Amino acid sequence: MTTSTPTVEFTQLAPERSFSLPAKKIFMTATSIWCAATVTLMVLFYVGVLDFVMSSRLSMYFISVWLNVWILVWFMRRHAGQGQMNFWHDLLVVWMLCYIITNIQWEIPWFVFSRLVFENIHTLDDLVAQTDYMRESPWHMYYWILGTFGVLDLRTVNHDGTFFALEMFSFTNLVSTLYFFHLNKKRSPYRYLLVVIGCGEPIAATVIFSFSEVFDDFVNMPGDVWDTLLALVWTQYQYIVFPMIFGGLAARMLLDDLRHSATRIE
């Protein structure tokens, strides 16, 4: 007589979770304000009200504030009576959308075109000297979009190899985020595993990004101490702190999904 050992298989669908309408409205409102503010800066630069340095610096502050929008969702929705896992899912989705939008809006276009666009740009003065070209035509404002971060960090315009290599992860994040939404639609119990696995990448990349410049004595930082803090701290802490937070939450949600989907096989 033989006895079979019970096993557990994950055959059931995970709980259905979607981006709630209230959280979506908060995200869309904040994103619309950020987009409008950025376009306003572009117009003010184009017509000569703002110079390249000031318009670029302000755009960096605006995007840094907008990347914190999940905190606004948490603050406004934390007592709304929503289930904990659904609430965490909303916060995670907001952060993932912010991250993927920055990938699409700047990082991937920069990775593809920067080596063609920026030629013989070694100093901030070299970059500012392109102002007349940018103001020649609205079509030339692509240069402003790609060049804004150069006001804070010249590695974005002088073909720095480390910076270029790190931005390759933008493609990985884009693909993994889209796949997460695919798995979520299928109610796969492994959907949050992608977040758990991927949360270490932005942390490692950001540490390399920031400290490689520290060890080089800030050679690519053309501004004052506040510009350096904006480049290496304020625009970057989100990619260290937030992945830690959401990696932990995703691990909790993954365990909840696995418990919900588990079937005991005798």
Label each residue range with its predicted role.
Residues 100-144:
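Transmembrane alpha-helix/helix-exit interface in multi-pass inner-membrane proteins
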Residues 34-42, 100-105, 200-210:
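Aromatic-anchored segments of alpha-helical transmembrane domains
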Residues 61-74, 176, 237-250:
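Hydrophobic cores of alpha-helical transmembrane segments in multi-pass inner/ER membrane proteins
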Residues 6-30, 69-98, 180-197, 254-266:
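Helix-loop boundary elements of multi-pass alpha-helical membrane proteins
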Residues 40-61, 75-88, 184-192, 211-231, ...:
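Membrane-lumen (extracellular) interface motif
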Residues 21-33, 53-66, 86-99, 162-166, ...:
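Transmembrane alpha-helices of multi-pass eukaryotic membrane proteins
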Residues 223-266:
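Terminal transmembrane helical module of multi-pass membrane proteins
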Residues 157-173:
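A loop-to-helix transmembrane entry motif
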